[in-house]
């Protein structure tokens, strides 16, 4: 069976950007570990904030952390108390000065990660998985930016003994198109029957401008009759395989038949003359 590659990593440098932007030589593994710990701390401590993604950018003596959230009030807290607490924990973890930026997600219903979290929360609240999936898809498709969505859940759905995978799709979700802007989100729902994984793909149109799709490619201009070359054709003319002589013979036969039809009904028509005129090729008037 073919497996699906991660849509974000598949399109890095084409339609998506890196979530961690820094360069390191000997400290590469240390920075990677710090990034993992920072994102893990954001996901565990702020479940109700609806965090979509965390971007990390490093300089020599400073770390910049951008938190994209649907509920910035929860992250900021009363008079900025929660933001100060988060900044203090990050400075203790990294040992550098931390610049914390809180960015609000304008349309959370069309964000793949937030949609996956919403479906997982409903599954944890014992809502039917089909109802949760369809409701999330309807809310996402109301946004004109969303061109297509696919929601997939896997696990012991409905408390069944055997785990299975089900998905619903609406619109177009071209996972093999590199220029397609596809957002991907994953979240796990903790239920009494075990964990249920939720995956969401959202297609938001093509992200790479200046490329024409096959449907929009300009067609070749058709030549008019006056634009054709005046050089006389040789051999077979046309796709039907008829020669110039055969065409003239057909015209002569049609003329003979028309004249025969115009004769009075009492006069007999010479059938041999009509047949011989249809089979003999017309003589060309051009000589040597």
Curated annotation (Swiss-Prot):
Keywords: Ribonucleoprotein, Ribosomal protein, RNA-binding, rRNA-binding. GO terms for cellular component: cytosolic small ribosomal subunit. SMART domains: KH. Residues 219-232 have a biased composition (Basic and acidic residues). The keyword RNA-binding applies. The keyword Transferase does not apply. One of its GO terms (biological process) is translation. GO terms for molecular function: mRNA binding; rRNA binding; structural constituent of ribosome. Part of the 30S ribosomal subunit. Forms a tight complex with proteins S10 and S14. PANTHER family: 30S/40S RIBOSOMAL PROTEIN S3, SMALL RIBOSOMAL SUBUNIT PROTEIN US3C. This is Small ribosomal subunit protein uS3. The gene is rpsC.
């Amino acid at each position: 069976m073919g497996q699906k590659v991660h849509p974000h990593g598949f399109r890095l440098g084409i339609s998506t950007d890196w979530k961690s932007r820094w360069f390191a030589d000997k400290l590469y593994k240390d920075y990677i570990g710090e990034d993992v710990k920072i994102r893990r701390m954001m996901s565990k401590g702020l479940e109700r904030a609806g965090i979509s993604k965390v971007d990390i950018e490093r300089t020599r003596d400073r770390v910049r952390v951008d938190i994209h959230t649907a509920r910035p009030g929860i992250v900021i807290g009363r008079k900025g108390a929660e933001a100060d607490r988060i900044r203090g924990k990050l400075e203790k973890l990294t040992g550098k000065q931390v610049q914390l930026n809180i960015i609000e997600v304008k349309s959370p219903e069309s964000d793949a990660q937030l949609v996956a979290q919403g479906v997982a929360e409903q599954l944890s609240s014992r809502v039917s998985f089909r109802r949760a999936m369809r409701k999330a898809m309807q809310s996402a498709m109301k946004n004109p930016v969303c061109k297509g969505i696919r929601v997939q859940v896997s696990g012991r759905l409905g408390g069944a003994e055997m785990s299975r995978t089900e998905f619903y799709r609406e619109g177009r979700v071209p996972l093999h198109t590199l220029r397609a802007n596809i957002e991907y989100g994953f979240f796990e729902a903790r239920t009494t029957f075990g964990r249920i994984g939720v995956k969401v793909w959202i297609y938001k149109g093509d992200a790479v401008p200046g490329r024409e799709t096959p449907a929009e490619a300009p067609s070749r201009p058709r030549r008019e009759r006056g634009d054709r070359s005046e050089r006389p054709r040789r051999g077979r003319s046309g796709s039907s395989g008829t020669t110039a002589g055969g065409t003239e013979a057909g015209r002569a036969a049609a003329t003979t038949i028309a004249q025969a039809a115009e004769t009075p009904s009492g006069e007999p028509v010479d059938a041999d003359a009509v047949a011989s005129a249809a089979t003999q090729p017309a003589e060309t008037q051009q000589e040597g």
